[in-house]
């Protein structure tokens, strides 16, 4: 019937929009993960492209369909949904990054590229945190998501301390320069 066809077209259109937005966020996550871990000296490409990307793509299909079925409004509600989707993923990435940095002996002698990539990761974390705080109801009780945000912020502070230690190690090893002092 015509109504069924229109429902199918609506569902498919909304599903494509959600899937593309989730895929773009996943692409940022994969790109930052690959850049950070390669700068630390850990080859995560087999895990990322062998497991993370295929499982993420398959999961995004299901999540996008669930969002459409839940009648989420694409314009008004997508940002809080994406924040709740990517906060756990970025928290896991930060925790794995801390473990990799601790295991790698050469982390304190990291290059500028690594420090710049860490800055990008911290900007994304700040964006996730600020948006979720601004969209949160002040009267709502603290739940699992707020606790997860605390873990994410704590992890980001540890990463920030590691970056600061690496910057100080670079200054100690190579001396002061205008770029090092400015950063």
Question: Model segments located where?
Answer:
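Membrane-interface helix-loop-helix junctions at boundaries between adjacent transmembrane segments
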Residues: 1-56, 66-83
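Membrane-helix boundary/juxtamembrane motif in polytopic membrane proteins
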Residues: 5-17, 78-84, 140-155, 173-183
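Phenylalanine-focused residue identity feature
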Residues: 8-11, 37, 49, 63, ...
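Hydrophobic alpha-helical transmembrane segments in multi-pass integral membrane proteins
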Residues: 24-32, 93-102, 157-170
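Juxtamembrane "helix-exit" motif on the non-cytosolic side of transmembrane helices
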Residues: 33-41, 98-107, 134-135, 166-175
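Alpha-helical transmembrane segments of polytopic membrane proteins
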Residues: 46-59, 112-123, 179-183
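Alpha-helical transmembrane segments in multipass membrane proteins, preferentially the mid-helix core
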Residues: 62-69, 124-139, 156-170
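Long, well-ordered mid-to-C-terminal structural blocks that present hydrophobic/aromatic surfaces
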Residues: 76-156
